[in-house]
Amino acid sequence: MSQVSGGKVPSYHAPPFDSPLSGATIHELRCLDTKVQLGFHLVPHIAKTLITELPSSAYVLVTDTNLAKLGAIDKFRKAFEAIPGARLLVYELAPGEESKSRETKAAIEDWMLEHRLTRDTVVLACGGGVIGDLVGFVAATFMRGLKYVQIPTTLLAMVDSSVGGKTAIDHPHGKNLIGAFHQPRYVFIDAAWLLTLPEREFSNGMAEVIKTAAIWDAADFEKLESESASIRAAVMGDEARQQSAAQGHTLATRTSSQSLLLDVIRGSVGVKAHIVTIDEKETGLRNLVNFGHSVGHAIEAVLTPDILHGECVAVGMVLEAEIARLVHGLPQVAIGRLVRCLRLYNLPVTLADARIMALSKVRELTTARVLDIMRVDKKNAGAQKKIVLLSRIGATVEERASTVSDAMIERVLAPAMLVRESVSAPRPPLTIHTPGSKSVSNRALVLAALSGGTCRLRHLLHSDDTQVMMQALAQLRAADFAWEDNGATLVVHGQGGRVLASDEPVYLQNAGTAARFVTAVACLASSASCSGSDESSCHGVVHLTGNARMKQRPIGPLVDALRSNGARIDYVEQSNCLPLNVTASGALQGGRIELAADVSSQYVSAVLLCAPYAQNDVELALVGGKVISQPYIDMTIAMMQSFGVRVERVAEHVYRIPRTTYVAPSTYEVECDASSATYPLAIAAITGTTVTVPSLGRASLQGDAAFARKVLAPMGCQVEQNDVSTTVTGPPVGMLKALGAIDMESMTDAFITAAMLFAVATAPCDEYASSSTSASPSSTRITGIANQRVKECDRLRAVVTELAKLGVRAVEHDDGIEVFSTPISQLLPHASIYCYDDHRIAMAFSVLACVVPGAGTEIQEKRCVEKTWPSWWDVLGGPLNVPIAGARLNDALVSLVARSRQRGPPTPTTLYGRDASIVLIGMRASGKSHVGRSLAKLLHRTFVDADVVFSDMYDIGAFVQDHGWDAFRAEESRILESLLTQCSVGHVIALGGGVIESAASRALLARFREHVGPVVHIVRDFALIESFLATSDRPAYGEPLADVYARRLPLYAESSCMEAVNTGNDAALALSRQLRTPLGTPVPISPAFFLSLTFPRVQDAWSILDHASAGVDVLELRVDLLHADGQPSIDDVREQVALLRQYTSLPILYTVRSVSQGGRLPDEANEAYFALTRLGLRMGCEYVDIELTRPSDGIEELAQAKGQTRIVASFHDTSGTMHWMAPAMRRLYTRACVLGDIAKLVGFARTWQDSLDLESFRTRVAQEAPFPLIAINMQAAGQLSRIVNPLLTPVTHPALPVPAAPGQMSVRDIHHARHLLGLLPKRHFFLFGSPITHSQSPLIHNTAFELLGLPHVYARHETDSVDASVEALVRAGDFGGASVTIPHKLSIMQLLDSVSPHAQVIGAVNTIVPHRDETTGHMALHGENTDWRAIVDLVAKHDGGRTRACTALVIGAGGSARAALYAMHKLGASRILLYNRTFEKAVNLAEQVPVEWRVEPVDSLALAAKAKPNVIVSNVPAQGTSFTPGGADIVLPLDLLSSDGGVAIDMAYRPEITPLLTLAQQHQSWHGVRGIEILLAQAFHQFRLWTGLPPPCLDIETTVYAAYRAAAASM
């Protein structure tokens, strides 16, 4: 940096002066020709200064309505009225970014012209940044430039937009795109305005203050760090808000806090003024004030207006600092200081901040999206992105923004990291410096805080965990913290054991160490309101809490021990976990404390650290079994001695701690983290290279320091270790040795690293082989690590699960895991490792990823390493020379809901192929095999029973007796792995009930459900299972059935992604319909209508459902109405969905509606809401409604878990307070577009205008941001909106007891209304053919039109040829469509513009569909064939799953035979026999059709009968067939239907029962299909093609059958 850096504008250094005009004490700076004056309560001063220095005929004050309400206008009027001759005009604006527009600018200019204002006018911009930018631009352009002054009223405007002369308005394409540089004459910074700000707005401005200090002035930054409480107190504290109106107006009345605040504002303005003076037009140096803005603006572009500018810049500063760390080596300590400083002012420092995570829009923030937005940045040079890079606090790498490649930005921003194989890259010996020890750092912080005096901590770990600890200790006022040596040294001013309760909750994130230690420290707290002798008698409360995972981690033994010693601690939610309320009683009693130490040594350390401040000496006895992690206890004792307290070990597990105080050393060196050191050392081991870690040797306090000697050396590594250094050289790649067995109880945190090495340790170790308890010479069993189940995640299960993704088998045991090594060449590529938000999982798996062949291994949740080694990825990709790159660039930058914190079990993904195998799991006797066999038949798949596969290989009882249950489960897992690999498509696989008892099997199922196909939990009522097993001969469990069921139930949920209820015979049918969602084509976005079911049980609707659902595409199941309190049980809902699936094939819209949204579920019942709604996803419902009013993290999770379910994101304004034209409605729409596949907004109509406003809204968003939208108004006045709504309109039916919402209409009523409004013009439909006099087609279609309220007419047009009359009808403007029958099915094609592939291959068209271009009005005629579809439908309805690969017989070779042959081919028949009375015609037709149809002509039906066909289709007149010779031309053999079940179809229209159907009636396993059924089925297809609506089938059938039979009776 040149001499420019660090300086401020010269006037910054001038002393303040008392204004001769107003008496106010003023600080003045200069920015170019602009005077910047700072002070308190300056309105009178402003008026007098302007009158004196800028005389004018008129002064125009432009402000917003919010400031007007706060009295701003009155203050200025009073000030100007006190000056004779001053003319003040006022213009008020609506607040908010929406005002910063062309329209508002024009309105101001029109107003100014109307008031005859001239060029001498002075404009006063009083407000925030919006006012300043807008009014400045008005001043820049009105009459080619007016004088104006800035009077910023927000901190952000004071230090940012008001200084520098930038003015602008927004454009739909972006912010500030139209503007000018126009310098104000004055900037009046009146800090008194800040008293009117909410705290969030104050913090918003502090982001810019911190920014200027970070890039320019280290001294200012230190001031912001150390004086945050005073700075905030100047305007945020209660005392400040109660000050007199003149407080601070003069230096004599100014408090120290006010002076400090003004000083930091002045410092920030001084920096910007200095930079602007040098570089007014932003050619280089002025870029620096954009630190944090390159990334911050991209974040803001997505999250505005919900997240403020300063909040986005705060996150941007941290991310850009991380980029500087990666590109130019910015020390982590600088980033840690920046993060802590931002947090001091309540600013977000990560996108995972709760305020950001609460927004659904955050899922739009992807790496690709941010990079795309960053492309448009004024700092950029063409395609090169420019970012301001810090070199340290107070300085930048260059005096301008620096060029940074996209790849570097991606590595920092991306939510995942791709780690590529690196064994081929040679490396010289490396020295890697690891961060300070987390364990030592956290203990040192507590010890220094509890000590009296000052202690300097060096090499402290700068990470999330230590930040949490420091924040907690500061919040409890146990210590004050400051930085020295440019942040390399933390200065701790301890309070000697004095701890005060905090009014705010102490948030401990997922920092387990901090949670345990701070719980003990909180027991020393006194109430902050107590003083003197009363302190012991008054009590505050310390509220300790954390994130979702922290609330699952145990703390019960510590709480029990502290309670036994007088502490008053209450659990707030569940027992044994945070949150806790600790009553501030001042001290522990002392004496004997018994503590269970078999779960975590941190409990012991927590008591030890605080014990000296008990009222008496403490004797700590460790009870309850083997003590876990004794080295960490020894570390605590050794560190306590360094701080002046000697702990006496009076027995093996009994310690005596004296009542005393800590005496801090002046300096304490934190040694490097031994657990973190295992990763670079392991990389040396696995890649055959050399790595040295200094500051870690035999003299370390940490147990993990022995990792190199006790793990790596026996595995074949060369290890050199002295007291202060460790060097490891690995063997040749692939030559690591397995250890057989190893106890890692003394270094539990290192077991994951060891497991990675054991995964590829294929060489057995002779020294350990004899003592191995493993079954494999190349496996290693790790013991002594049971406590790792309750760390950041269940690490044992996580390692087993994630290793399986790489093809490595591992098995869980009670006290550890066994890892079976795999050759490096056999590791699976393309794995995606989920890290469970656990830093050690991420770093350890990145070690193993170094040797995985292929394109790379993806490490998800890469930011979790920030807990202990924030720069790990920089080190891995830098000094360690491992090829890495950002991954998942199109995924959200933050995972809003990690799987380890999900509210419920998994759901299906979008990755399944349509033929993906289906895996069934569930309790013994749940019906897996029965349902599976039936399902396999329905879906034409192969059924596999895993238990049968096992029993074919082994005698199960003998196997268990000889090898034990562990070996049985291991072999079961091996067989499962084989089945899932070899039978991944085209199968239904039923598994044994206990398969989920094995962690390895659960990992295999998890991988299968995530990537291959659905795993379905078959649920059956427990009483039925119990009853069945009580009378079965299956072997007993050896424990109560209820206990087995209770243990397995959560494991079934965890292992499956769907669940289905075995309700009886139709369970397979219901499941087949359920599986259409994950395995079929996604349902359409825009069906026309859905019917809302309002019954307490779906069974109650069965009698009317077919009638009530006429014309609807979807059924809505109102789950909240299934119980009187709106909260039905999961079991009840599961059963109701299954029953509905059995009864209807219509798609389901699954809705849980809250009270405030017009339903029955209580609004506060969030847990019930999310559990019930998630069930809809697991039940495979095609559409699921999610309410936008529910907590964002929960609905975001549902949206992410949707699979192929369509999400309807809904909002219902039941109170009528939301206006369609209000910005809030647009924001709801935008949010719904982000979360859902369909947006649903429901308003409340009181007048006709409300519906007109809705239509304006619909039109506007369709033009600006088109998205599938349901937009309707409730009540009768809103029925217009229901009439014109284009998709998924909710409807009722007269047969329903009540409408689901006020104003609902029926399908029939809506169509009538649409016709009257001209939205549904009348169309004419025809039947072309001859003879057609007796055709039922007009009755079919006209009945449908009438039932659904359609205005159309269907008529016969009989003609012998396709003549001019036919052409005239099909070309008419009101032509709606036509049916075509003999003899025109071929000749009609000459009039058509297109013919479907089906109709082409059949060679016949029976349906004409007009396609209209709504823009040009042009109509194209399209030909279809629905005959074959009707045959397929009716065979599928009755075949019971037999037709796949079956034999089919088609009788007759006439015109309709081709459709029948095509239908048989589409059904999958492996052999199609074709018989015709004239054999030659059958031969000719067989030769004409494609050879892949496999059509074989036969000359005898007797021969056909021997082939045992499963499907028979007759295409000859009924009178042409009989059972006896001479009766007709074709004799049907009596054994023609000799196969075991099938479907016989007679295409003949009359009589109703033909000889073939008579034959079917004589065979109970055969189903006969009448010609009238085929006519109806093909007509139903035609109706949907013409209208887009489902026909009212049942009502049509009733009408048509009656007419058909009446006509037959009259013949």
UniProtKB/Swiss-Prot annotation:
SUPFAM superfamilies assigned: Aldolase, Aminoacid dehydrogenase-like, N-terminal domain, Dehydroquinate synthase-like, EPT/RTPC-like, NAD(P)-binding Rossmann-fold domains, P-loop containing nucleoside triphosphate hydrolases
Catalytic activity from the UniProt record: 7-phospho-2-dehydro-3-deoxy-D-arabino-heptonate = 3-dehydroquinate + phosphate; 3-dehydroquinate = 3-dehydroshikimate + H2O; shikimate + NADP(+) = 3-dehydroshikimate + NADPH + H(+); shikimate + ATP = 3-phosphoshikimate + ADP + H(+)
Localization per Swiss-Prot or TrEMBL: Cytoplasm
UniProt-listed Enzyme Commission number(s): 4.2.3.4, 2.5.1.19, 2.7.1.71, 4.2.1.10
Note on cofactor: Binds 2 Zn(2+) ions per subunit.
InterPro entries: Aldolase_TIM, Aminoacid_DH-like_N_sf, DHQ_synth_AroB, DHQS/DOIS_N, DHQS_C, DHquinase_I, Enolpyruvate_Tfrase_dom, Enolpyruvate_Tfrase_sf
Ligand binding (7-phospho-2-dehydro-3-deoxy-D-arabino-heptonate): 144, 160, 166, 176, 208-211, 272, 286-290, 293, 309, 378
Subunit-level organization: Homodimer.
Protein's recorded name: Pentafunctional AROM polypeptide
Naturally occurring in which organism (per UniProt): Malassezia globosa (strain ATCC MYA-4612 / CBS 7966)
Higher taxonomy: Eukaryota, Fungi, Dikarya, Basidiomycota, Ustilaginomycotina
